[in-house]
């Protein structure tokens, strides 16, 4: 008597479970590529990847973490001066004005040439 509704429910569940497709991890792949290009200090490939993905550094700066660091800290830690300067130039002055990244860089990588670039951009 209740076989038809049970059959419909079971069929719906089965079809639903097989038809689910996990979302493509394009964002994850973009983040991995950006982190790799920063670590390799490859500014040209970084610019190309950002342009082809139609994103800007200032829009993704807070969202992407590379080895637990933001993009600028990752550049400082990787001694990636070229990509670090590119990141600094594409960030707003207000995002650097708090001095948190400068303090982190001075505390952990005092010899980095990016510290002067960050200070100059932030107006400190």
Q: What do these predicted ranges mean?
A:
Residues 1-10:
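Bacterial N-terminal signal peptides that target proteins for export
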Residues 16-23:
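N-terminal signal peptide c-region/cleavage motif recognized by signal peptidases
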Residues 27-37, 58-72, 96-113:
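Ankyrin-repeat boundary/"N-cap" motif
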Residues 123-124:
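Short, solvent-exposed mixed-charge patches
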């Amino acid at each position: 008597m209740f076989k038809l509704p049970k059959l419909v429910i079971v069929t719906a569940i089965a079809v639903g479970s097989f038809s689910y497709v996990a979302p493509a991890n394009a964002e994850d792949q973009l983040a991995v590529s950006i982190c790799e290009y920063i670590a390799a200090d490859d500014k040209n490939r970084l610019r190309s990847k950002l342009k082809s993905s139609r994103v800007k550094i200032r829009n993704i700066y807070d969202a992407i973490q590379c080895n637990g660091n933001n993009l600028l800290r990752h550049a400082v830690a990787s001694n990636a001066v070229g990509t670090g300067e590119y990141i600094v130039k594409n960030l707003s002055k207000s995002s650097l004005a708090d001095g948190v990244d400068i303090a982190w860089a001075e505390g952990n990588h005092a010899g980095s040439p990016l510290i002067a670039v960050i200070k100059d951009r932030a107006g400190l």
